[in-house]
Amino acid sequence: MTQPSNPPGAQNDAARVLVTGANGQIGRRLIERLARSNPPVPVRAAVRSARAAETLEALPEEIRPEICVVDYRNAGELAEAARDCRYAVHLVGILKETATSRYEDAHEASTRAIADAAATAGLRRIVYLSILGSDPKSSNACLASKGRAEQILLDAKTPALILRVPMVIGPGDVTANIVLREALSRALPLAAGGRSRTQPIYAGDLIEAIAAGLERDDLDDLILDLAGPESLPQREFIERAARLYGRRPHIVSIPTGLILFIAGLAERFFTNPAITKTALEVILADDDVDPEPARQKLGIDLTSLDEILRRCVGPQATQRE
């Protein structure tokens, strides 16, 4: 493990938070949110490579965290990274397996390591980001792996808050750019004509949920299904985004089985296909949960779908970030 790099003005603080997978979009948003808290919450960001560390080193000085490079599967390295921290936020995870990145390593192994590290370091709580539908008994390899990771945390010594979320969308992020591209398409092929239900949550709301997990006392050993306030078919979601531009794409219905078959073939003939059958199954799964229990438990507000689209996809959002 590389030793943490201390940003200017860094201070030791009992409320320090270890964030794993901190170089991703959610991690960077969380770092900024905590840095701008009153008082600021110091963050130690754990990443797995020097290249990932460079992403965080490029952040503005006033929000730049301590940075350390670790092996997410190494409990000893994570325990050292967690020294002097009170909480950990575990954001490590993948949707698509590759030849060098497997579900077992990204989910179960990394979660087992952070659980062991948290016990060694005496952390107060781990906040874990999971996926709606995660279940050890799932027939989907990704959701089953996530479900096993959840169980590791529930069985661990350190209390955990598990947040299961659907699609997360924020200004300027990859998801927002994909939705914008689809909304502006003249013709858009969608599995089953876009009948699968989606329930996107605003990235800022998720960040507030994670922050609540670092601030509230009544969130130990909980699994919360957290989603946006509205569930609707994918087709309607894209059409609503398109209306912000006075557009309406022509939806071309493609049989779901055919899409999954093609994805399966791609896995057989390419070492790193753009999408896999397993990842597609997660993307096409129906997201339709009641977010109110989680919202109330966390004490947060949820941004309406129309406001999400305005901020992330609408004409005023296209130049952001």
Question: Which residue ranges define each predicted feature?
Answer:
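A short helix->loop->beta-strand "cap" motif at the edges of active sites that frequently abuts
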Residues: 121-125, 158
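NAD(P)H-binding glycine-rich loop region in Rossmannoid oxidoreductase-like domains
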Residues: 51, 55, 60-113, 117-119, ...
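Oxidoreductase cofactor-interface core, primarily capturing Rossmann-like NAD(P)-dependent enzymes
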Residues: 13, 136-247
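N-terminal Rossmann NAD(P)H-binding glycine-rich loop of SDR-like oxidoreductase domains
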Residues: 9-40
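SDR active-site strand-loop-helix element
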Residues: 20, 46, 91-92, 126-132, ...
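Conserved glycine-rich Rossmann-like NAD(P)H-binding loop of the short-chain dehydrogenase/reductase
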Residues: 39-51
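Residues forming the Rossmann-fold NAD(P)(H) cofactor-binding site
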Residues: 28, 108, 147
